């Protein structure tokens, strides 16, 4: 497949998005990195797996800023993932931001309901493994 990167925004103590990101990364054979720890993607990647969850039903400002700062020349394609109680607004908003920047975004994405994280861990690993 080429180079793969997993980036995520997780701001709660529960760390649902972090856990799903780590499982996806394990399946893909890479390491998940928080955008709060490493705010810029500095090297070309063929596939960026990017995820976050809505907070108070809106995308985290840090995730929005990260998406807006991405350099289209550094990214082949983005595949999204999200964790939430009901809303997939984060995915919809990210698709819009990234596509307006000219970044290719896959139509399909990975979703894990916040109350079913444990039962979605294996599926997250398998999702990541598809991109090896």
Give short role names for the model-derived ranges.
Residues 2-37, 44-132:
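FMN-binding flavodoxin-like domain, especially the glycine-rich phosphate-binding loop
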């Amino acid at each position: 497949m080429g180079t793969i990167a997993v980036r995520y925004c997780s701001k709660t103590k529960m760390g649902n998005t972090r856990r799903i990101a780590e499982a996806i990364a394990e399946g893909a054979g890479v390491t998940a990195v928080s955008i709060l720890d490493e705010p810029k993607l500095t090297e070309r990647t063929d596939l960026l797996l990017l995820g976050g969850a809505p907070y108070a039903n809106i995308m985290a400002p840090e995730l929005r800023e990260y998406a807006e700062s991405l350099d289209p020349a550094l990214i082949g394609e983005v595949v999204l993932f999200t964790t939430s109680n009901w809303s997939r607004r984060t995915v919809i908003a990210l698709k819009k931001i990234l596509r307006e920047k000219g970044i290719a975004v896959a139509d399909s994405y990975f979703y894990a309901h916040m109350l079913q994280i444990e039962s979605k861990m294996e599926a997250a690993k398998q999702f990541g493994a598809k991109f090896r």
